[in-house]
């Protein structure tokens, strides 16, 4: 078994250095009927960078690592897929800017790959999924395409100001897991570094209380980051050896600003709301030392997979979007030692919900069956899998036949030979 989510490895790897080489690689694959799997950094939680079929070729984009343009005034950057968060951070920091980091995604990850796959960003509750603007790439049939200003023949570097809306066709390439083509250049948004940052904690005795509190605080539009974690996840987040002194659930709220007075009035507002909720807004979490600093560190520099895994153990996240009522029903499906994170989306109308399965290495086959059983129950309850894994793709297709019939017709239009990451997303 290659990984929890995939049994296959690519037969070989190619490393293009420019979009022309990407285009030639795709054209050759079409001639030879060879499946391609685009890889930027392999840090996407569900191993979508590994093939779902035999004899695939990995297209390693790590050598395409140029920061084409950085606009500090408008807080945007045009980058290639090999640019990592660590690489982009240095020039951004010099301009007083920062990137929007993703949950579980380390600094060595591709910025473009992370944003294209819509890995959940800590900043989504505040900024929503608008981290990408225009893009350029090569379709699965070998044709070059671009969106917004990048599609125009202007001799200027700042081709990002005319982006795309969520309803436009370009968004099909988001969360597509490389099934429609390869993006070779894209504009991403940046944020200003705030000198004042404050972390607050709100303890909850159950998951129902946690989702209610998340809804209440996100409605104020004051948190820059906000999420809830159960005590298993929380202990790992804070580097604690056990969960004894932690509440069953903790809502974490981060406020940012440019003056201490700004943080002070935000704290006053949030404290008043906490009292209405019959709870307490705290800057400490039990006996944990420097809990707030540890949260800020994890947000700015996520640990990644190793946050949850130890020697001899495995970790498998279940990536979903669900309503509060669906979450409450789903919680009982997971073992007591499971970690879980919930982040409000759309002002609390729904949530990014990431419970997980823990297991000892060697138990993968058994845990796969558990994973699929749980996924089936979640699908029947109406829970959405925004990025299906290779394991549950068929299940997701079976529950959404009309949607995937349309997706297949779109894929056939741009990938007539079915060479781009076949069998991903059930395509």
Go through each PLM region and give its residues.
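Conserved glycine-rich FAD pyrophosphate-binding loop
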Residues: 8, 47-56, 60-62, 273-427
């Amino acid at each position: 078994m290659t990984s929890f989510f995939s049994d296959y490895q690519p037969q070989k790897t190619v490393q293009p250095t420019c979009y022309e080489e990407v285009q030639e690689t795709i054209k050759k694959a079409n001639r030879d009927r060879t499946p391609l799997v685009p890889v930027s950094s392999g840090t996407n939680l569900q191993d979508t960078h590994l093939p779902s079929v035999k004899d695939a070729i990995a297209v390693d984009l790590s050598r395409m690592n140029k920061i084409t343009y950085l606009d500090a005034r408008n807080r945007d950057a045009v980058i290639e897929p090999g640019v990592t968060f660590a690489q982009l951070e240095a020039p951004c920091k010099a301009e007083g800017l920062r990137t929007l980091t993703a949950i579980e995604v380390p600094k060595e990850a591709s910025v473009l790959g992370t944003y294209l796959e819509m890995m959940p960003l800590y900043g989504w509750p505040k900024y929503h999924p608008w981290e990408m603007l225009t893009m350029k790439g090569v379709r699965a049939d070998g044709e070059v395409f671009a969106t917004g200003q990048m599609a125009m023949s202007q001799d200027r570097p700042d081709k990002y100001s005319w982006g795309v809306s969520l309803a436009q066709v370009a968004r099909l390439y988001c969360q597509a897991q490389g099934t429609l083509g390869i993006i070779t250049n894209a504009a991403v948004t940046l944020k200003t570094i705030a000198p004042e940052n404050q972390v607050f904690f709100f303890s909850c005795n159950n998951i129902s209380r946690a989702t209610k509190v998340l809804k209440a605080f996100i409605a104020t539009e004051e948190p820059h980051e906000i999420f809830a974690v159960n005590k298993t996840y929380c202990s790992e987040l804070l580097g604690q050896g056990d969960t004894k002194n932690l509440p069953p659930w903790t809502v974490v709220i981060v406020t940012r600003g440019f003056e201490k007075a700004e943080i002070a009035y935000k704290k006053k507002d949030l404290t008043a709301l906490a009292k209405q909720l019959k709870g307490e807004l705290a800057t400490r979490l039990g006996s944990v030392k420097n809990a707030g600093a540890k949260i800020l560190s994890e947000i700015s520099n996520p640990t990644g997979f190793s946050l949850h895994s130890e020697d001899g153990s495995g970790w498998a996240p279940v990536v979903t979007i669900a309503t509060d009522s669906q979450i409450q029903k789903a919680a009982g499906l997971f073992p007591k030692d499971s970690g879980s994170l919930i982040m409000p989306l759309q002002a609390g109308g729904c949530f990014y919900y990431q419970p997980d399965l823990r297991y000892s290495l060697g138990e993968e086959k058994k845990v796969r069956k558990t994973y699929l059983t749980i996924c089936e129950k979640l699908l029947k309850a109406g829970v959405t899998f925004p990025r299906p894994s290779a394991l549950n793709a068929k299940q997701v297709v079976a529950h959404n036949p009309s949607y995937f019939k349309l997706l297949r017709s779109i894929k056939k239009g741009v990938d007539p030979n079915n060479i781009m990451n076949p069998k991903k997303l059930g395509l």
